[in-house]
Amino acid sequence: MDKLKKHEQICKELNSLYCRKNADYGDSFGKSYEEFGPVIAAIRMGDKLNRYKALIKGRQQVNDESVRDTLIDLANYAVMTVVEMDMQSGGDAE
């Protein structure tokens, strides 16, 4: 598989995970973003980045999340933040 196809596959995976989590938890990120603004995105992504750093340094204490899982979550938080920014501005970045 070439890198363009792999990127497309990962983006589909991101969307699938986003849909499943929204079905389970509702739009909790959107509600938090509405209440606290961009700072909530920085906090959530900061938590994931700290988790990533702990994993790559071998300091993991919980075995149920891999480096890949953490990076997927981090990517989804970045996309969700762009969605909230676009929704607030009433625009679509396309």
Question: Which sequence ranges carry the predicted segments?
Answer:
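Intrinsically disordered, low-complexity regulatory regions
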Residues: 1-94
